[in-house]
UniProtKB/Swiss-Prot annotation:
Function: Catalyzes the GTP-dependent ribosomal translocation step during translation elongation. During this step, the ribosome changes from the pre-translocational (PRE) to the post-translocational (POST) state as the newly formed A-site-bound peptidyl-tRNA and P-site-bound deacylated tRNA move to the P and E sites, respectively. Catalyzes the coordinated movement of the two tRNA molecules, the mRNA and conformational changes in the ribosome.
Top-level division of the source organism's lineage: Bacteria
InterPro entries for the chain: EFG_II, EFG_III, EFG_III/V, EFG_IV, EFG_V, EFG_V-like, EFTu-like_2, G_TR_CS
One annotated GO molecular function: GTPase activity
Coiled-coil residue windows: none
Protein name, entry field: Elongation factor G
tr-type G domain ranges (all copies): 10-290
Residue numbers binding GTP: 19-26, 83-87, 137-140
């Protein structure tokens, strides 16, 4: 690397490139790396050569799955770029990169405008107050419309765009942009694909006559927005004085850093036009690590005690681990954002989140998947670390003498799960290693060992998410596994009280026999309150010796593991032992255990047993025009609509829907709403299954 890490933090930018799938985000990143001199040959996503798409599946699918961190230099500034995925199933990657960014470039497709995933990512960026500039890409595409895209930024995102450039020409005739600050035209001559300099040089010309009027109109809007940033500028503006270029740039920077407005640029990354002015804008308008002020955290033992760390080399060390990746040679790489202090390789740090000490191995600045070793890490930068054993995504690393916990990230609960089992005995060990590593990388995968079936279940954020999991397992860890269909966890319970069940267990087999007699009553408990089981002993006068009573209880619990209807675990039952009898020689703990178990099975059959299913609280955010379709669809899934509310530009529908009806929902929702609606789903409660559905479940369990 030609330059070392810049120590002047005013000249550092930690940015993300965020966009909808296919808006040209990876191509834009590639061009940035090309113009900043990191790459000598351009990588194109559609031939699988892009630098940041470095995992095998990404090359195949042409979508960016993991955010690789890349460092480059422009105009004497260092830019650390995090490439983020644009697919809805990978929102956790986006969340975790936004948490550690200072600013972002939002890339939009000039033909499609603001698309659903851009909406989702934009709202996530709002959550972390990330300042953004916008790049309207693909201006060379048929049907590209810059003004339409700017309009969708207002209508769909409720954001305030600051138009900084106008396109010159459109589609095949797109040749450059009008810069509204200098009021000059930047033109990339010739066919950029055949141009030897690959669009690296552009000519500065006068604005074409047909655009002069439009350019003046948009410049006035820009100057007016800037004038509002201070009384001094407002006065100057009202008196008809021209604002200087420096004043306009300072005003735009202030609006951007405060996330009050978003400068909009345009170009075609694929045709190498418009990328350099956008890089100039990253340097001119996006914040440096010092702009956000000291980083806030809390004391290790008390969340109420707020702690601060200055963004400087002198402050105590603090950093956030925001991504774990498995590297073919080094093993586990932990990506960290250093917020304060400095650290040399070999030093010891405290993982404050887990309360464990870690030793730092090698330190790198990353360029996609090439590494540049460094001797120390300093505040304000992003690095990859080797040698951390217990650190996972969202953990805080800090100076052991000055512990602090930085705000972590919130990860959603998985909405879908599949059973997975190794094809051979030899795959068993590989499978557990693979699962362990993949879960450390992505905390939205959850692993659960199903005690009822003995299978390992993997939960994730969607079907594509689980596909990629299985795919990586096969490819990176060479595990062959069978993957089952998504499953629902049903339960069984009873509806009415049974006053008295008598059961005698008697066996005579030469020598000592077995004898136990019990009398029990059973009644339903409130499952909504989470009451699973209760046992009461009401026997008087020693009719059942004290040492045998726990055995009756244990026998009932044995029987509850498999319900009488379809074999699902039972919940919500209270059992009372009323009476019984024993035999001095033939009674034993085992005899009473069997009696309890059999009495329970007999009693449950008389107590109107039913099947319960998990109900999910589903929230759908949809543009108003699809509201009817969304509600109709939820009703057809046995959903109960709970409420409908307004949010920025969308309607929010809340409903309770059985989990079994939600499989495949994401695909249906996307097709019904042109992909513009998003939903989230969390477990709510268990509820009784309608008779027709229960019959089906029982039949299925008997048929297996």
């Amino acid at each position: 690397m030609a330059q070392d890490v810049l120590t002047d933090l005013h000249k550092v930018r930690n940015i993300g490139i965020m966009a909808h799938i296919d808006a040209g985000k990876t191509t834009t990143t590639e061009r940035i790396l090309f113009y900043t001199g990191v790459n000598h040959k351009l990588g194109e996503t559609h031939d699988g050569g892009a630098t940041t798409d470095w995992m095998e599946q990404e090359k195949e699918r042409g979508i960016t799955i993991t955010s690789a961190a890349v460092t480059c230099f422009w105009n004497d500034h260092q830019i650390n770029i995090i490439d983020t995925p644009g697919h809805v199933d990978f929102t956790v990657e986006v969340e975790r990169s936004l948490r550690v960014l200072d600013g972002a470039v939002a890339v939009f497709d000039g033909k499609e405008g603001v698309e659903p995933q851009s909406e989702t990512v934009w709202r996530q960026a709002d959550k972390y107050d990330v300042p953004r500039i916008c790049f309207v890409n693909k201006m060379d595409k048929l049907g590209a419309d810059f003004y339409f895209t700017v309009d969708t930024i207002v209508k769909r995102l409720g954001a305030r765009p600051l138009v900084m450039q106008l396109p010159i020409g459109a589609e095949n005739d797109f040749v450059g942009v009008v810069d509204l600050i200098s009021m000059k035209a930047f033109v990339w001559p010739g066919d950029a694909k055949g141009d030897v300099t690959m669009g690296a040089s552009y000519e500065i010309r006068e604005i074409p006559a047909e655009l002069q009027e439009k350019a003046e109109e948009y410049r006035n809007e820009l100057v007016e927005a800037v004038a509002e940033t201070s009384e001094e500028l407002m006065e100057k503006y009202l008196e008809g004085e021209e604002l200087t270029v420096e004043e306009i740039q300072a005003g735009v920077r202030q609006l951007t850093v405060n996330a009050e407005a978003y400068p909009v640029f345009c170009g075609s990354a694929f045709k190498n036009r418009g990328v350099q002015p956008m890089l100039d804008a990253v340097v001119a308008y996006l914040p440096n690590p010092l702009d956000a002020g000291p980083v806030k955290g809390h004391a290790v033992n008390d969340e109420e005690v707020v702690l601060e760390r200055e963004v400087s080399k002198e402050a105590p060390f603090s950093a956030l681990a925001f991504k774990i990746a498995t590297h073919p040679f080094f093993g586990t790489l932990t990506f960290i954002r250093v917020y304060s202090g400095r650290l040399e390789s070999g030093a010891q740090v405290l993982n404050a989140t887990k309360g464990k000490k870690e030793r730092i191995g090698k330190l790198f600045q990353m360029h996609a998947n090439k590494e540049n070793p460094v001797d120390e890490v300093v505040a304000g930068h992003i690095y990859a670390v080797i040698g951390l054993k217990d650190t996972t995504t969202g953990d805080t690393l800090c100076d052991p003498a000055n512990p602090i916990i930085l705000e972590s990230m919130t990860f959603p609960e998985p909405v879908i799960s599949v059973a997975i089992e190794p094809k051979t005995k030899g795959d068993q060990e590989k499978l557990s290693t693979a699962i362990q590593k993949l879960v450390a990388e992505d905390p939205t995968f959850r692993v659960n060992l199903n005690e009822e079936t003995g299978q390992t279940e993997i939960g994730g954020m969607g079907e594509l998410h689980l596909d990629v999991f299985v795919d990586r397992m096969k490819r990176e860890f060479k595990v062959e596994a069978n993957v089952g269909k998504p499953q629902v966890a049903y339960r069984e319970t009873i509806k009415r009280k049974v006053d008295k069940v008598d059961y005698t267990h008697k066996k005579q087999t030469g020598g000592s026999g077995q004898f136990a007699k019990v009398q029990l009553s059973f009644e339903p408990l409130d499952t909504a309150e989470g009451e699973v089981y209760e046992f009461e002993n009401a026997v008087t006068g020693g009719r059942v010796p004290r040492e045998y009573i726990p055995s009756v209880d244990a026998g009932i619990q044995d029987a509850m593991k498999f319900g009488v209807l379809a074999g699902y675990p039972m919940v919500g039952v209270k059992a009372t032992l009323l009476d019984g009898a024993y035999h001095d020689v033939d009674s034993s703990e085992m005899a009473f255990r069997i009696a309890g178990s059999q009495a329970f099975k007999e009693g449950v059959r008389k107590a109107t047993p039913i099947i319960l299913e998990p109900l999910m609280a589903v929230e759908v955010r949809t543009p108003e025009e699809f509201m009817g379709d969304v509600i109709g669809d939820l009703n057809s899934r046995r959903g109960q609509i709970q409420s409908m509310e307004d949010a920025t530009g969308v309607k929010v529908v809340n409903a309770l829907v059985p989990l079994s009806e939600m499989f495949g929902y994401i695909g249906d929702l996307r097709s019904k709403t042109q992909g513009r609606a998003v939903y989230s789903m969390t477990f709510h409660s268990y509820a009784e299954v309608p008779k027709a559905v229960a019959d089906e479940i029982v039949q299925k369990s008997q048929g297996e």
